[in-house]
Amino acid sequence: GGGGGGYRGSSVQGQIEYSRTFGKHDVNALFVYHQKEKVDNQPANDEYKVLPYREQGLAGRFTYGYDSRYLMEFNFGYNGSENFISGRRFGFFPSIAGAWVVSGEPFWEGIRSKVNLLKIRASYGLSGNDYLADSSNNIVRFPYLTTVNMNKALYVWFSPNFVKQTGHEIKTVGNPLATWEESTKLNVGLELGLFDALTLNVDVYKENRTGIFMQRRSLPLTMGLSGVTPYGNLGEVENRGARV
């Protein structure tokens, strides 16, 4: 455990690693478990900041290579977030990647002095985000909970002298279906090396983000929630591009 920067906390981490080379085969595996908790020492009258931040997860990586020419990697994360209701807290996020070092092939020998590297690679993966934010970019904790203002002063119609009375008011509407924002990304790349002096990397990618946490535009007035519009995993964005 430790403190600093306004927080105190504790963490636990353990890992198991395996590595072996036999002949032209290289095999590596890694599994990591982590658990973390931190508490804000200065909650600033925010009832949510009084509560500890907790996260838990298991991650793994497996790599295989043959003769430094054919490469494969598989990763996964199984992560738990306190931000979501029981049954929706854990997400599984895998990815896979492969590469072919063409310049390592015997038929490349004749031009290796000019083109010393040609590597083709591709990857596809799913990632998740549990740090949700509202329209003002404030971090939202426990979006599945409805919050109530117990001391809202409101004018009461037909009351003596039309005075304000203290009552209850819904501040935020909880969404029990709130869960991880997800992103899938496909990447295809090429690495080219010339004369052992010049290197060129080219990547083409496509990314789809789904379940983006955002506010609904409107609700029926019959719900009695005028001015309080709930959030949900509603948004989608697609990005395409290239990097050199």
Task: Put a short name on every predicted segment.
Residues 1-244:
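Extracellular/periplasmic, surface-exposed regions of secreted and cell-surface proteins
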